[in-house]
């Protein structure tokens, strides 16, 4: 039996996010970086894992809600120091939606993505979009 760990899931999510954005982070955004980032993606597993069994053979599977958060730096102008960079957010969101479904053969799949927060200010110079998807094991 293949044991699937949270680290396996996060690593796969991170690899897929890197196809869309050069800078990615696991679980949470950093408090500080060496350079000002214009865009980045955070991949996380913020919810509990649901273990399920089925039948007399005790076949099992996991269901987890996974989260991809896209952060785009605000445009700073004299008239609006927190202007939302809508073209950049749209580009990244559309590109990320294109990587689904994410399938690791004989292990798990991540599918049914949905945007749950379309664009909101984080109060720290970025707007973010949250995309949730369903991860289900395939063993």
Regions found by a protein language model. Give the residues of each.
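Short catalytic/ligand-gating loop segments at beta-alpha or beta-beta junctions
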Residues: 29
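Charged, amphipathic alpha-helical segments and their flanking helix caps
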Residues: 1-25, 33, 47-139
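A short, hydrophobic beta-strand-centered structural micro-motif
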Residues: 36-47
